[in-house]
A protein has these predicted regions:
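Alpha-solenoid helical repeat scaffolds
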Residues: 6-766
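N-terminal secretory signal peptides that target proteins for export/translocation
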Residues: 1-5
Length: 766
């Protein structure tokens, strides 16, 4: 009996274990476990974790429509729009009757300005769900995107009539009414939304934002405090209240309030990060970095804290620390897009722009909508000298992230480089809209107006820049620039000095003050001013650069210029401007080999600076070291393929060394396109055409070179006359040939090809 009982027990246990193993391998069970886990994370607002679990569910069953839909909702919460779109699309493919997914898809397409495709989904929804209030809300969104606000309001009102208890509809109606300046009606509907769902934080905050926009600041503060009471654990109303304080100029109150938020929400990542984010947003990188360093030590497992700390370390140029922490992030998740963007930033700062483009393009393959990745990819292309591609990336950045102010600043800088003042004004307006309390937008718009001699609006913007940021040098520098252009030197001097009082390290202020003295032919005063400021700020590479420039260009003091520029380079090995000028000084004093050594050392710290290779090539050319000159120019073109100066010089060297004439022609044409006003570019292209036997075309270009030199008041170039004389000889115009060949020897009796000139003249006489 006992043996039989034991056998039965073993049999039962065996069956139970078999059943358990079978269940654990059942794909439907596994799918459901992942789905339920994802739902729990979603309910706790842990959307990244939810997306992983929903992703696991659809990996087990790729046709699990509800899993795809919940994954889409997670991506929407994470603002990963492309992936959300893909999952919504997959949802309606698998379950065409999931009309809520179609509504979400239509709204996402509207947000992405794909109105045609959105209309197709809305047409289907109207035919299938004509009385669904959310369908009419989507129609209202579409009409709003088409700027038809009256029709949009009618649709949202229809949505309310179909679903009068939906607080979201009242909120959307209020937002539309605010856009059409129906402010009183908007207030009523915002209050209705709050009444219908007091827990709806979006409605609570929208009402506070309404009061703030109407400058009813006391009511705004009261509303935000009510929102805090509604959900004491939510960081959102606290963030809104902090922004209100900041908008009122209550910086110290904001700081103290956020310190309290950190104490109130010790377990909420958004809450305890607010203080560090405040320091970052207000430009206090030292405090922000210190705060995040402390947060990282307190919350080492908080990935967002770690990421924000990495970003701050990059901005502080503490690259080794940033690299170490970021490598840890990528080791944990090689496809972490934020960490890939950080790696790209580090590579840019290391001067490895080519590597940065590869890293950032990988990030964009994972998330094509990443405005931040587009922005930094633009910086990498800019470092490589590809401004057109850089601007394209920056435009993509602001398309996906319109609030990304740094991308608007980059576009402003690009417009300034191109001399496109209309584009600069547009970018300045974007900066102003995003940061009305920053002086930068006003200053940029002032720059565009000064360039177009619109002095009155420029001065108005400058006064506004000073008003919003009286402790910043930005407004005072622009006031100095305006007065300098107007030749009001006393006022210019005063403005620049005020800027230096606000920020003794301001290179723009010191440079402007020195230019004011130079404009009055007072170089000694400019030098004295530079030395005076250097005595206050002794570690500024830029200040020594300014001093060296005046000593070189205005005082012709080669020894003093060399000492100042060497100090500038010593303080900042990446100061390419100082290094380039240092080489020029060394060339001027006849130390060609020393200049070459300077450029070679400079390249080690600035490997992507094509100018060093071009100048080095010119020095090798002067030594008749053709191969090294050729290699240097080619390296410059590897970095900047369309660089006109490198193209011109390489074409000329190829002709001098018997290189491929067709390749030289292509290079010379590139140079001519890039430098249409350059006598040298016209001469080089003419010389290539001479080699190809197109003598009349060559003559036209040599004549153009002479005209351009005369126009720019450049000294007569014996080489152009030599080339023109030879071309006239080939064109059988001996009188003109003799005239230009004789001119060569008058300009420079010791011309390098003087013997060939005399030989040609002798042949013409015979």
């Amino acid at each position: 009996m006992r043996l039989s009982s034991i056998c039965r027990l073993v049999l039962v246990l065996g069956l139970a274990i078999t059943s358990f193993v079978a269940c654990s391998r059942d794909p439907n069970v596994r799918k459901q476990k992942y789905f339920e886990s994802g739902q729990r994370y979603f309910d706790k607002e842990k959307y990244r974790e939810a997306s992983i679990q929903f992703g696991n569910a659809v990996q087990v069953d790729p046709r699990f429509a509800q899993g795809h839909y919940r994954l889409a909702q997670s991506f929407l919460k994470l603002q990963q729009w492309t992936r959300a779109y893909q999952e919504l699309n997959r949802t309606v493919e698998l379950d065409p009757e999931n009309y809520q997914a179609r509504v979400d898809l239509a709204n996402l397409l509207i947000a992405g300005h794909d109105l045609k495709q959105a209309q197709e989904h809305i047409d289907l929804l109207l035919s299938k769900q004509p009385n669904d209030p959310q369908v009419h809300e989507a129609i209202a969104n579409l009409l709003s995107a088409q700027q038809d606000f009256p029709a949009a309001i009618k649709e949202i009102q229809k949505s309310i009539s179909l679903g009068p208890d939906r607080w979201e509809a009242y909120l959307n109606l209020a937002l539309l009414q605010m856009r059409t300046n129906q402010m009183d009606a908007a207030e009523g509907n915002l209050k209705k939304a709050v009444q219908l769902n007091p827990q709806a934080m979006n409605a609570q905050l929208a009402l506070g934002g309404y009061y703030q926009a109407r400058n009813r600041l006391t009511e705004a503060e009261e509303q935000y405090r009510r929102a805090i009471n509604v959900d004491a654990k939510s960081p959102d109303p606290r963030a809104a209240l902090a922004k209100l304080y900041l908008a009122e100029g209550k910086r110290s109150e904001t700081e103290e309030f956020l310190k309290q938020v950190k104490r109130d929400l010790p377990e909420n990542s958004v809450g305890y990060r607010m203080l560090g984010d405040f320091y970052f947003a207000t430009g206090d990188l030292d405090k922000a970095t210190a705060e995040y360093g402390m947060l990282y030590s307190e919350h080492p497992k908080d990935v967002q804290v770690k990421k924000n700390y990495v970003q701050l370390l990059i901005l502080k140029n503490r690259l080794d620390e940033a690299r170490k922490l970021n490598d840890e992030l990528l080791k944990a998740n090689p496809n972490d897009n934020e960490a890939l963007v950080y790696r790209g930033q580090i590579q840019i700062r290391d001067g490895h722009a080519n590597e940065a483009t590869q890293t950032l393009q990988t990030a964009l393959k994972n998330d094509p909508d990443s405005g931040v990745a587009h922005f930094h990819l633009g910086l990498a292309f800019d470092q490589l000298g590809n401004l057109a591609r850089a601007e394209s990336e920056w435009r993509d950045a602001v398309r996906w992230r319109p609030e990304l102010v740094e991308a608007h600043r980059a576009l402003a800088a690009a417009a300034l480089r191109r001399g496109d003042m209309d584009a600069l004004e547009q970018s300045a307006k974007q900066v102003l809209d995003l940061q009305p309390l920053s002086p930068d937008g006003y200053a940029l718009r002032a720059v565009s107006n000064i360039a177009r001699k619109r002095f009155a609006p420029a001065e108005e913007d400058i006064h506004k820049a000073i008003e919003v940021a009286p402790q910043s040098p930005v407004g005072y520098v622009q006031m100095g620039n305006l007065k300098l252009v107007q030749k009001q030197f006393v006022e210019a001097e005063k403005a620049y000095q005020q800027a230096l009082e606000k920020d003794p390290r301001s290179t723009d202020a010191l440079g402007g003050l020195m230019n004011t003295y130079l404009a009055q032919n007072q170089p000694d005063k400019a030098v004295a001013t530079a030395n005076s400021q250097i005595s206050k700020v002794s570690n500024s590479s830029a200040f020594y650069d300014l001093l060296g420039t005046v000593l070189l260009n205005n005082k012709k003091d080669m020894k003093g210029a060399e000492a100042a520029l060497k100090k500038a380079a010593e303080l900042d090995k990446n100061n390419s401007d100082a290094l380039l000028k240092l080489g020029r000084v060394q060339v001027a004093k006849g130390a060609t080999d020393e200049a070459i050594a300077t450029y070679q050392n400079s390249i080690k710290n600035n490997p992507n600076e094509a100018s060093f290779y071009i100048l080095m090539g010119e020095l090798y050319e002067s030594k008749k070291d053709w191969q090294k000159a050729k290699d240097a120019y080619q390296k410059a073109l590897d970095l900047k393929p369309d660089n006109p100066l490198a193209s011109n010089n390489l074409a000329y060297v190829m002709l001098e060394t018997g290189g491929n004439v067709d390749v030289a022609l292509s290079l010379a044409q590139t140079a001519r396109r890039g430098m249409p006003d350059s006598p040298n570019a016209a001469d080089t292209l003419g010389w290539v055409l001479y080699q190809k036997g197109a003598y009349q075309s060559a003559i036209d270009l040599f004549q153009e070179a002479l005209k351009l030199a005369e126009k720019t008041k450049a000294p007569e170039d014996a080489t152009v006359h030599y080339h023109l004389g030879l071309a006239y000889e080939k064109a059988e115009k001996p009188t003109l040939a003799r005239q230009h060949l004789e001119r060569v020897l008058k300009i420079n009796p010791n011309y390098s090809a003087a013997d060939d000139v005399r030989k040609a003249l002798a042949q013409l006489k015979s």
